Amino acid sequence: MADTARGIQRLYLTLTLLTTLAASFIWGVNTLFLLDAGLDNTQAFAANAFFTLGMVIFEVPTGVVADTRGRRFSFLLGTVSLLLSTVAYWWMWLSRAPFWGWAVVSVLIGLGFTFFSGATEAWVVDALAASGFSGNLETLFG
């Protein structure tokens, strides 16, 4: 059982690392993308702040969705949210949309990311419980 729990923890940490790495690559060029879309420096950084605000606002509610409606449903909502908000991002870039549009879509992208984190955390808690893990989850979630 201890090997199973360690494997689950490793998989969770790997998924978290890969998700963080992918987001880092995206956000590494996002400011340049926003500047190319016609926003000034202040607006571009504010749009990025709205993304963070979206993540802060929606982290707990989307975790509840994963716990009550299921991880698969939460992943589906995250996928749909990110697909629609990414299409909106692209359309806004094409149309040189005003700042308020970028702020709204940035919040929605934050929403999409939180659906994934809530589902992943719900999965690891359930998987560890099923494996008989009796340790402290604080060591995993920090």
Placement of each model-derived feature along the sequence:
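Helical-face signature of the major facilitator-like transporter fold
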Residues: L15-T16, T20, T52, F99-G110
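Hydrophobic alpha-helix/TM-entry signal in multi-pass membrane transporters
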Residues: I8-T16, F75, W102, L140-F141
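C-terminal ends and interior cores of transmembrane alpha-helices
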Residues: L76, V80-A97, W102
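Helix-to-loop junctions at the C-terminal end of transmembrane segments
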Residues: F58-R71
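Cytoplasmic membrane-interface "Motif A"-like loop-to-helix N-cap segments
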Residues: T68-T79, F133
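Cytoplasmic helix-loop-helix junction between adjacent transmembrane helices
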Residues: V107-G142
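Helix-loop boundary and gating motifs at the non-cytosolic
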Residues: A2-I57
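Membrane-helix boundary and inter-helical linker elements of multi-pass secondary transporters
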Residues: A37, D67-T68, S95
